[in-house]
Each structure stands twice: as C-alpha cells, then as structure tokens.
Amino acid sequence: EKEYIEELDSTGYYFVHNKTKAKVFYLENTDEIKTFSIGFRTPPKDSTGVAHIVEHTVLSGSRKYRTKEPFMDLVNSSLQTFLNAMTFPDKTIYPIASRNVKDFYNLMDVYLDAVFYPRIYEEEKIFYQEGWHYEMEDLDSPIKYNGVVYNEMRGAYSDPDDQVSEIISEALHPGSTYSHDSGGNPHHIPDLTYEDFLNFHKKYYHPSNSYIFLNGAMDIEEVLAYIDEEYLGNFDYLEVNSKINQGQSENKIEILDKTYSIGAGEKEENKAYYVYGLTLGPSTSPMDRFMRSILEDIIIESDSSILKDKFLESGLCEDYFSQVSTSISQDFFIVGKNGDGKSLDKLVKIIEDGLKQAVEEKIDQDLLAATLNSFEFSTKDLGIHKGVLLNISCLRSWLYDASPIEALKYKDTLAHIKENLDKGIVEEYIEEKILNNPRKIQMTVRPKPGEFLEKDKGQEEKLRAYKESLSQEEKENLVKETQDLFEYQTKLDSKEDKATIPKLDLKDISPGVSHLDTEVIKDGDKDLVFTRAFTNGIYNMTMSFDLKNIKAADLPYVSVVFDLLGSLDTENYSYKDLNNQVDIHTGGISFSPAIYQNPKTLAYKVQGNLRGRTMEDKIDKYLDL
C-alpha cells in the first residue's frame, strides 16, 4: 500500500514481512530527524503490571549489548533526539530518533536486540530488580516487597486522581482488557510469577505481533534489508492471539458508589469525586477522535465552555476536569473533584440540562470557531518529536486492524467539521453520543482513610505467614538472595560489557549545520526575513522593534508594558473581544522584551519582540489584530 498524505507532505508505504507477517509502516519525507519504533499489541489479562515490567526489563541488557542498563548508556553516548519506551493500556512501544545516520542504526539495533533477545531468560535477577522480589536483609528482619515497577506504582497509586481514573476504566469496561491496569496495581504486582512474566514476552514479543514504524529521510530499502537480515529473518511466522477483549457492557445507566484511599489520618470531608462517564463505542474514525477532543474543550475545559460557569456557580466541587481515552473504546468522562459525596444527582442534572440547552439553543459560534482553531493548531504542529507523535497517532487505527494511514489523514474531516459548524454538527454529536448514549456510569467515589494501609497490612500478614512457613535453610537462602541481588545491582559493568555499547567517532559526525531556506528583503530601514519550510500551513511570525530610544531609567518598565500588551482594551476591541478574536484567528500572540549583546563590542541592544502563529487563510486578520 502506498499513498501520498497531503497533511504531512509525506508518502506512506505499508509493508508486510513475507516470512513473519511483521507489519511495517514508513513515512517518506524530508525530516532530517529519523524515527524508528517497534511496538507490540500487549493486552493485559490482570493488573500485575506484566506489560510494564517487560518494558523495563528488556532494556536491561540483551544478546549483543551486555551492560545492565544499555538504555541509560545510550542516553549518555548517543546523539539521540528521542529515546524511550511506553506502556499503554493495550500496546507497548519502543521509539528512538536521531539526525545522525550511524546513531540511528545504532539505536535501532539496540532496541531490536532488546525486544527480541533480552537477557531476561538468562538472568532472573533482572525480573526481581525491575518487577518485584522478596527482600529480607537478615534472619531477624521482616520480609518485604521491593522492585522498581512495584515502587513506581505505589507512588502512582498515592495520587487520588490516578486511583479514580483506574476505577472509572474498570467501571466502564468490566471484564475487558481496559478493566485492568497495564502499569500494575501495587497490591497485585506480587502475584506475577517469573514464569508468567517470561511467557508474556514469549507470546507477544514476536515479529508476527509487531508494528514497526519509520519516519524521515532515509534509504528505506537499506533499512528494511537490515531489519530483515539481522532480526525478522531469524524468526518463523507465529499465530499470536493478541486480540483485545472489549468486554460485554450492558446498555444501561449504572449508578455506582466506590471508594479510593487517602491517608489514615486525613479528614474525609469534601473529598468525594463525582463521575459522569460513557463510551462512544469502538471506533478508529478520525471524526470520532476529533469530535471527542473538541467536545472536551467546548463542554468543560475552555474558560468559555458550556458547563464551566454552571459548575462554578453550583459550588458542588472545588475542581472539574474531563478526560478522553487513547484506545479504541473512545471513552469520555467528566469528573467533579472534592465534593461532599451527596450531590451526584445534582451534578448529573447540571451536565445534562446544560448539554440539552446547548443543543436546543445552539452553541456560541465564536466558542466553536476558537475551539476548532486551537484543535487545528495542535493537530498540525507536532514539534521536534513529530515522528514519535505520528507513530502514536497511526497506531490509533493500525493497532485495531485498520490502515495506519487512516489515522493520519484529517484534512477532509477537519474541512467537513468547519463547513458544518453553523449547521449543528457539534450539537447533533452531543445529542447522539452523549445525551442519547445508552451506556453511562454515574458514580460517586468516596475517600476511605487508610484503605491502602489496610491492604498493606494484609500483605504484611501474608508475608509474615510466608516467613513462618520457611525452614531455617530457606530463610538463610532468602537472605543470601537479597544480598546477591544487591551485589548484582551495585556491581559495575565490566570493560568488556561496556565495550558492547555502540558509540560514535568524530568522523561519524558531520561538522556542518543545517541551513534553512532563508531570504532577506530590504524595505527601507526594515529587514524582512522569510524562511521557507513545510509547516503544514502554519505561518510563524516575529516582529522585532528596536528600543534604543528608551532611556536607561525607564528600562525596568519595559517588561511591565510588554506583560500588559494583549491584556488591555484597544481602539477596536475590548480586552475580552480581543482575546476571543486571537483564539479564533491565531495560534497565540505573545510579547516579550529581549537584551542582546554583541560578542565583539560587548555593546547591548534592547529589542521588543511580538511572536505569533496563524493559518495561511487568516494572515490578514492576524496582522490586523
């Protein structure tokens, strides 16, 4: 499959590896930052955090790269612009990026070796270090749980917002892949055995279940040949069942009452959460994805949103927020935070009455235009990590057996929404997908002091009983295993192991710098500087003013003046109207003074800068503002 994607000024190539059926998607363009990523569909069947632990452990040494932390070694020895790994609710990805060709190959090779040939099969201590292990310092000490992911998730679960988010996912998708925490619940992580951990890797980390993404200017035939010869060609096809369990949720409104944990000594008053949640249904459609993001802003997140003032006037909660999922389930929920725990029905009424009113009376067109404008900028401007973000974007369709190109093309969808803004497209979507949605949860999540402490005590009792069940010899072995793990963790890598980590020589680094296509035009005493580059229709503009005539005594006031610019009424607009017009027609306008020093003469120059962004069809309005 080959298709030009106008929105990205890129040509997409979709390949399937002959032998293993590994899936490869390449975006050919002029981006000097070359991006590679390999991902796997990794649906969890419980909350032991196995997907998260595997992500950590495969980066702890492999067949070729023998140090304990090749990942951190690469951070210090490469020219990478991105190097990370990420666990999602249903997938795990390993993206890297670099401008340097040799560095790109080095990073790609380290990651491919890591995912396909990790040391986890030969060194059990990697699992104990990164996942969890029993720890007993001496015969008189109690047995404890310890481990990198275990401790990380204990920290995550201390945040009430994170707890509530997991409770919502479980409530919306009972019995499904999304009812489990792929990151790991700290009270379930110790249920994971070393054998189950290895089996998870064996099952899912196979080329037949892989999604390989490439972006940028590169010799794609050479790259594909390398991946095939060094890795994919060493495997045979394997039928991998990585199907995502969508669950069997009933189409009904559920009124739920749950609890989350707070500190044992904390007060419970006004710490309840209210949740109004629903799922828009399985979809890889750009329209559904776009509309969900737009609805977030229009309904609650924007200062001018439909419900913001109504929420604040009600006094039911201290704060409100909404959230959308990144998976196929298309979740959308509104949360009221720090309420009295008695007002769920009032909050639901505010939400549904407010949305019904918006549908009947129509949403303010300026709010719609400003929201869509903001969304368009965020969609088009991906920044320096563009390749990684495109990888995540294409998986929104690709992971669910649709074309990766589907999630990247948005021009027609965006145009359709723009053309129909004043014809009720958003109002119709709210009515159909939210108000008339047959599957909703309305939930109160109450604070329970010491809830985690109770679970911790249960674990401590379990560990106490486990210690009592051990013979003297088994206890001595556990103390020795604790000491052995500590020695493994603190032992420095050998010179031989360090030598396996790829490094760049000076000859591998180009001494030149990238040059932009820039033109300078003289207009009287002004210099007009034009830089040409693919910006997806976004015009970035800077206007600089020489402030040499300002007296030295007045310089402290310059920053005050620039802070006030854009925050005051003008000749043509009130402050509120001005900001509204800026939101509708630009990607933001900022004002800032700057002081520059000539490195030769050491003379100073004070300058005022106006920076802003706009779309091609809005330049005149931008300049007017």
Which residues does each PLM region occupy?
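Alpha-helical scaffold elements lining the catalytic groove of polysaccharide deacetylases
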Residues: L192-T193, F197
